[in-house]
């Protein structure tokens, strides 16, 4: 026996078999050891050969295990095994068979054939009992080989390579494993048209990710199976090439090329009966390329040019431009077929076609209105992905969430069960008590417990019954789907008797049973289990994905929106017009009456410093999100240079920071529903506003990397001090129309008409009146109280102290900011000293009263001692 005459895989198997014999304590290395290792192989080549030869691989495995169990075992041996006589004869038989077939190396299939032929080996009888004859096995080997010989140590990789490195889409279509393909007739027809050409008959499907390129290939496979193709494509096989499997494990140089050549040779030998589908076609360019080696695309070019290889490619627009178009020789061998994103109406049709498969998988029903909502909401709110993929994902996740709810215990039952457990614990505690009152309580508790247990048992039974009904409907759907598949197979095979039984007997009966089961599901007036996916479920998933509140408003939220002015007025004093304008925009948006192609609202807040422009924006973020941090604040004083616009939308290609994206665009991409504040806009360079034109008009902006960012769910607020001198000069009771005209003149001089024309409303903030200062004092002190609440210190302000602070903090030219300084000077600073001196320990109540030129702090009721 010359080990060099054996292929790499056979050598590996023999090594494994020898190791196994040693581990088991067998003294002899027998054919049974070799057969066991061959049958245990992950890739299952030997098992596959046995099955194809009409044998039973499982039976062969059992027989081998039984034979090995009979072999004598030796313990404490010298750690070596001896080659048995039968195995030596098997090796000789394998070498003879290889020589006879013209092979340079003994391969796995020749070794298996020798194990079946050599009568002195126990493996011959094992394989014979499993139903394998040497003649049939030899026949199968010749079918796989197709006249090719093993002339390299890795020869096995070249045999039956399509089965290893490709999926048969037509076989999957025949078995009903592919999802139905709805619409896309034009693209499939165009693909068939290109495939039917004499030369350059290789279409490449080009489109955005998620528009259904792979689905078109599956649609072609379904058409081939149904015979709905021209004569030139009838009975062809569509095989999807798996580039990952081709590359994986190719350790040595030339191994990848050898595998790919084997695939191409097999396709060529079929005489045009195989169409190769290469998904993610751009992976061909550069695949397997190493120093001096050819990549996959160069290996394909000659076969494509000669028309020996029928190929359908699929890739995205970006990848096609980046990889395939650069290689002009490869690009010209393919004929592009553009796959456009379907419309919302087409997407609804696609979802209706897929609905049954998803209902069957999740075991819930999906309403038609949910499909319409999935298409419409995904189109409107999920802007960075494409239809129909995003709509299908929405439907899938909504059904998955509902299934989880069905499998979980209903809330009312869960509460009952917890109450029962609580009462049982109380009962055990009361049993230990001997007094009369405890015994009375125990008797009452026993009554409560028994009634609760009865209620829980009834609810559990009802829940289980509803779940069971749902399960029955799902099982019927599965049976119906299998029957329809069987009908199609019977029609294709010409088994008309079976087809008639299915079409006029089995299928109508199943449909009737399913209709009855579904009508019973909906019969309950108040079901515990929701079994239908509704538009609300879809809206909830959209809200989870994007953070945009799409789902149905609860009663509490409606009331909150109707009282929005009152809520905002708690934080912003004296600016009724501004509060109303902002509130109207939010209500319009949440009621669904907002223009879907523009931001929720865009406002310019004009007014002197310190009157509440930025404060109103913060209050709005707090109202909408219960969180001030949901505010994207951009200080325009940082954008005084022309080039600084790159910081907003991201640096262009070739500049430092290109990969990082822009401050504005990245924030809105991650959180599409937020308030964007451009503070002090008059300080920015005028060219910065050119970027905002399409945001204000179309609700979108293209960032430095060419991605479109959606601003349709943002509220854009810009603040400015322009014309503040006119507003400051305005008296308390003067007419503001003339002042407004003066302010607008200044604004028009500072900003271009096309910018101002796109803003929804320009709102003037009035200077603060003395009468409004008391309310602002309360707002500012509320913040101080929150800081003190950590130390359980309560701050109580007398009316005279409030007036004192309002007087000291009022300055018409500077708004409310001097009040902050007054509170800091007269309240925070002296209070900080007293707290540090220990005058007001934790838990104190501090009363603040006005003095002549300062505020006095006194320990209030509830304190341990008096302090002046």
Swiss-Prot record:
GO terms assigned for molecular function: ATP binding; ATP hydrolysis activity
Region annotation Repeat 2: where it falls in the sequence: 83-147
A cellular-component GO term for this protein: cytoplasm
Signal peptide residues on this chain, from the entry's feature table: none
Repeat 1 as annotated region, ranges: 6-71
Positions with a binding annotation for ATP 1: 207-214
Organism: Rhizobium meliloti (strain 1021) (Ensifer meliloti)
Gene: clpB
Protein's name according to its UniProt entry: Chaperone protein ClpB
Region: NBD2, residue numbers: 557-767
InterPro entries in the cross-refs: AAA+_ATPase (IPR003593), ATPase_AAA_core (IPR003959), Chaperonin_ClpB (IPR017730), Clp_ATPase_C (IPR019489), Clp_N_dom_sf (IPR036628), Clp_R_dom (IPR004176), ClpA/B (IPR001270), ClpA/B_CS1 (IPR018368)
Lineage per the UniProt record: Bacteria, Pseudomonadati, Pseudomonadota, Alphaproteobacteria, Hyphomicrobiales
């Amino acid at each position: 026996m010359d080990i060099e005459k054996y292929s790499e895989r056979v050598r590996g198997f023999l090594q494994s078999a020898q190791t196994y014999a040693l581990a088991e304590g067998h003294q002899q290395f027998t054919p049974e050891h070799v057969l066991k290792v061959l049958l245990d192989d992950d890739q299952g080549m030997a098992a596959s050969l046995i099955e194809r030869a009409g044998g039973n691989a499982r039976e062969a495995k059992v027989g081998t295990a039984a034979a090995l169990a009979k072999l004598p075992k030796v313990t404490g041996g010298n750690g070596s095994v001896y080659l048995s006589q039968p195995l030596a004869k098997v090796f000789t038989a394998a070498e003879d068979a290889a020589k006879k077939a013209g092979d340079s190396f003994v391969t796995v299939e020749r070794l298996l054939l020798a194990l079946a032929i050599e009568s002195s080996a126990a493996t011959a009888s094992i394989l014979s009992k499993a139903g394998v004859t040497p003649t049939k096995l030899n026949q199968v080997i010749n079918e796989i080989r197709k006249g090719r010989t093993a002339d390299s140590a890795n020869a096995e990789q070249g045999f039956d390579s399509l089965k290893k490195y490709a999926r048969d889409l037509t076989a999957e279509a025949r078995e009903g494993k592919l999802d139905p393909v709805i619409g896309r007739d034009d693209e499939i027809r165009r693909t068939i048209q290109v495939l039917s050409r004499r030369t350059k008959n290789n279409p490449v499907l080009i489109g955005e990710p998620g528009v259904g390129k792979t689905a078109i290939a599956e649609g072609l496979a379904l058409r081939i199976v149904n015979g709905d193709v021209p004569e030139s494509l009838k009975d062809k096989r569509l095989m999807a090439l798996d580039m990952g499997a081709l590359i994986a494990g190719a350790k040595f140089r030339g191994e990848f090329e050898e595998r790919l050549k084997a695939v191409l040779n097999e396709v060529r030998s079929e005489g045009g009966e195989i169409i190769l589908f290469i998904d993610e076609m751009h992976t061909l360019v550069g695949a397997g390329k190493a120093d001096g080696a050819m990549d996959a695309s160069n290996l394909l070019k000659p076969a494509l040019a000669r028309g020996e290889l029928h190929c359908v490619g699929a890739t995205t627009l970006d990848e096609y431009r980046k990889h395939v178009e650069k290689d002009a020789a490869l690009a010209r061998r393919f004929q592009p077929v553009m796959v456009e994103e379907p419309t919302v109406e087409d997407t609804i049709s696609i979802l209706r076609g897929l609905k049954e498969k998803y209902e069957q998988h999740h075991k819930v029903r999906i309403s038609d209105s949910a499909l319409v909502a999935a298409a419409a909401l995904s189109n409107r709110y999920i802007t960075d992905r494409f239809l129909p993929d995003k709509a299908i994902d929405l439907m899938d996740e909504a059904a998955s969430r509902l299934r989880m709810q069905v499998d979980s215990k209903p809330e009312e039952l869960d509460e009952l069960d917890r109450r029962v457990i609580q009462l049982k614990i109380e009962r055990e505690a009361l049993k230990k008590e001997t007094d009369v009152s405890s015994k009375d309580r125990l008797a009452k508790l026993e009554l409560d417990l028994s009634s609760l247990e009865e209620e829980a048992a009834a609810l559990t039974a009802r829940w289980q019954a509803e779940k069971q009904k749902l399960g029955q409907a799902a099982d019927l759907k599965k049976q119906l789907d299998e029957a329809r598949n069987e009908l199609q197979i019977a029609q294709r095979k010409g088994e008309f008797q079976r087809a008639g039984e299915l079409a006029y007997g089995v299928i109508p009966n199943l449909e009737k049973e399913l209709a009855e089961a579904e009508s019973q599901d909906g019969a309950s007036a108040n079901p515990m289990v929701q079994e239908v996916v509704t538009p609300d479920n879809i809206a909830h998933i959209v809200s989870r994905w994007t953070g945009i509140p799409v789902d149905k408003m609860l009663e509490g939220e409606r009331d909150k929106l109707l009282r929005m002015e009152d809520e905002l007025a708690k934080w912003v004093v004296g600016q009724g017009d501004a509060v109303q304008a902002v509130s109207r925009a939010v209500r319009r948006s949440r009621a669904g009456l907002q223009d879907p192609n523009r931001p929720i609202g865009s406002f310019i807040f004009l007014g002197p410093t310190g009157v509440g422009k930025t404060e109103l924006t913060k209050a709005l973020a707090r109202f909408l999100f219960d969180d001030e941090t949901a505010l994207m604040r951009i200080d325009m004083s940082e954008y005084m240079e022309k080039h600084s616009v790159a910081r907003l939308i991201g640096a262009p290609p070739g500049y430092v920071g290109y990969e990082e994206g822009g401050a504005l665009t990245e924030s809105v991409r991650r959180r599409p529903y937020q308030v964007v504040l451009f503070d002090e806009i008059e300080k920015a360079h005028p060219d910065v506003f050119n970027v905002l034109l399409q945001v204000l008009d179309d609700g979108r902006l293209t960032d430095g990397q060419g991605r479109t960012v959606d601003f349709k769910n943002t509220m854009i607020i810009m603040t400015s001090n322009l014309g503040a001198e006119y507003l400051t000069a305005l008296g308390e009771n003067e007419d503001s129309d003339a002042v407004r005209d003066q302010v607008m003149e200044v604004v028009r001089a500072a900003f271009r008409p096309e910018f101002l024309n796109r803003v929804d409303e320009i709102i003037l903030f009035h200077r603060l009146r003395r009468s409004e200062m008391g309310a602002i004092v309360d707002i500012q002190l509320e913040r101080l109280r929150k800081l003190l609440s950590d130390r359980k210190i309560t701050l109580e302000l007398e009316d005279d102290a409030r007036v004192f602070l309002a007087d000291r903090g009022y300055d018409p030219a500077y708004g409310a900011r001097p009040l902050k300084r007054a509170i800091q000077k007269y309240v925070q600073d002296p209070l900080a000293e007293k707290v540090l001196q220990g005058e007001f320990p934790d838990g104190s109540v501090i009363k603040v009263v006005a003095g002549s030129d300062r505020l006095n702090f006194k320990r209030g009721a509830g304190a341990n001692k008096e302090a002046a």
